[in-house]
């Protein structure tokens, strides 16, 4: 899971990259081809993110944080669309994306994982039922959509750790 940051111009993209490098980021190679226009970086803790080229139509109206991108086949996108009640805004070429009806960044999935999973996810989503909601009912609803409970060694905690159909961990919190 990583962030896609957008750019208004080539200079803006270069400035975002320079700022990230000044803050301890570094260039990384994830198999991108030399002719790709986006820049792949990692933050000081090794979390990947991309600085997308200007003029990217897919992320054009999403804001600076264009997307939260993750590996995963189409069923993962279908699951999250149903789980969050957000419309599927892209379903093409083994890639899916959802977006809040209110706008903002997209959440995207595309293809199989590029690297084998090693331990728990470094980044994950938290789902919080409404204040008057019920955690158990939300867990049951998500299981009905294709999620499953998992144990990652969390012990006795107030949240429930689950995995989506692609094996990505997420937590269901107590009502907030």
Annotate each predicted stretch with a short phrase:
Residues 34-36, 155-157:
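Short, small/polar residue-rich loop motifs at catalytic or cofactor-binding pockets
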Residues 160:
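Hydrophobic "anchor" residues on beta-strands that sit immediately upstream
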């Amino acid at each position: 899971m990583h962030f896609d940051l957008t750019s208004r111009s080539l200079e803006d993209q270069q400035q975002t990259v320079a700022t990230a490098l000044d803050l301890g980021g570094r260039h990384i190679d994830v198999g991108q081809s030399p002719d790709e226009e986006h820049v792949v970086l990692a933050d000081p803790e090794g979390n990947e993110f991309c600085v997308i080229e200007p003029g990217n139509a897919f992320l054009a109206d999403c804001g600076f944080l264009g997307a939260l991108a993750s590996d995963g086949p189409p069923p993962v996108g279908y699951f999250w669309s149903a789980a969050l009640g957000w419309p599927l805004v892209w379903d093409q070429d083994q890639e899916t994306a959802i977006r809040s009806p209110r706008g903002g960044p997209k959440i995207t999935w595309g293809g199989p994982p590029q690297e084998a999973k090693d331990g728990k996810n470094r980044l994950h989503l938290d789902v919080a039922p409404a204040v008057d909601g019920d955690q158990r009912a939300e867990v049951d609803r998500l299981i009905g959509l294709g999620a499953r409970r998992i144990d990652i060694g969390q012990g006795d905690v107030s949240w429930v750790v689950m995995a989506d159909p692609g094996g990505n961990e997420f937590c269901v919190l107590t009502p907030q």
